[in-house]
Amino acid sequence: MRNNDWHGGDYTAAGDAWAHAADDVTATALAALTPPALPAPGRETTADATRDTATARRTTRVLDVGTGSGPAALAAARAGARVVGVDLEPGLLRTARSRARGLAPTDGTVRFVAGDALALPFAADTFDLALSTFGVMFAPEPAKVCAELVRVTRPGGLIAVASWTPSGIMGRIAPTVRRHLGPEPDGTPSPTDWGDPARISSWFAGLPVTFETRVERVRVRYPSLSHAVAAFENKPGPLRRHRAALEAARRWQHARADLAALFALHNRADDDALAFDAPYLLLLARVGTPSRTPTAPLTGLPDAADLPAVRAPRGSRAH
């Protein structure tokens, strides 16, 4: 997709409503990568095991691709990891850096850099965990994105990607608006393609990974229906491009009414608020073969401050 879809607007007004999903995805991925330690023989309490797990996390290198305003990157840092968040949009990176100032001294480290999911500015095997929450789904050439995620993740490391499902409410928002512009050309990629396990399997074909997928849900809540509609119609991304085209054709108000009707149909709030459960597909992919899997967390990786802040060519996005 075109990077200018993400210029301006207010992403956080909409995106913050589901940002807590990043906490769940990050916790799940870190637990799969570094399972909680059990008390070793001769150690009497689980406190020692908890400290062992925390120590292991201190050496865990995490890459958040399409970091946006940084919810997943910050969640990983709060868990003690050493994190790099990558995005193409300067405004979102500024928001992420501002929010990183709220990390505690006892948390891990995080750095946010400009970069493209199609050409990540890191050496091979750099990270223990590469994750993306509703980020890489917006990048073009998904097979190339998968290859890049595998390339920068060490053998035995993990890839975790969360993406909206096509049939869920979040996957239906863009089509609900887009249909007022007429049918899209055959073969036009959709961000919700990442919510289809069969497509994911085809993208990873030939790459050294084993993976599983499962559907999870996140409760999305806004103060009211009107707040939700306003948040989405001003949110940067493909929807705003559709809105501009519909306004030019004087059809936006019809599309806006359909968007409001979609939200109302899925509303689960028992007050004046709007709340709905949004399903997403969680992909967990293990890189490399078991024989190559290290038995301990990888150490000796470069510090986040040493990683290059390379601005990739414009024209595609990781978020």
Please identify what each model-predicted range represents.
Residues 1-42, 46, 50, 54-57, 160-185, ...:
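Conserved class I S-adenosyl-L-methionine
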Residues 34-60, 104-108, 288-318:
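Intrinsically disordered, low-complexity terminal tails and inter-domain linkers enriched
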Residues 61-120, 144:
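Class I SAM-dependent methyltransferase SAM/SAH-binding core
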